[in-house]
UniProtKB/Swiss-Prot annotation:
Keywords: Ribonucleoprotein, Ribosomal protein, RNA-binding, rRNA-binding
The protein, known as: Small ribosomal subunit protein uS14
Species of the source: Caulobacter vibrioides (strain ATCC 19089 / CIP 103742 / CB 15)
Oligomer and partners: Part of the 30S ribosomal subunit. Contacts proteins S3 and S10.
Name of a matching Pfam family: Ribosomal_S14
Amino acid sequence: MAKKSAVNRNEAVKALVKKFAEKRAALKAIANDETLPLEERFEARLKLAKLPRNSAAIRIRNRCEVTGRPRAYYRKLKMSRVALRELGSQGQIPGLVKSSW
């Protein structure tokens, strides 16, 4: 089980990303638009830099929904390999069968 503080911090980052997503996208569009004057684009870059660091989507860490574990994460199932193995052996995941040959 992951530390509650780490899981809560990640949730706070997700909230910030959601809050600033629209503003960040608009500033990025201005900064990357080559038809605009250089000063305007540079100003947009400065405004983008002033936004909170944790408002960038890259700061979100994929964590297991069951345990909060940050590593060995399967995106499709939103869980770690440890939780997958545990729930799979209990028969909690439909369609998952232990392989045998």
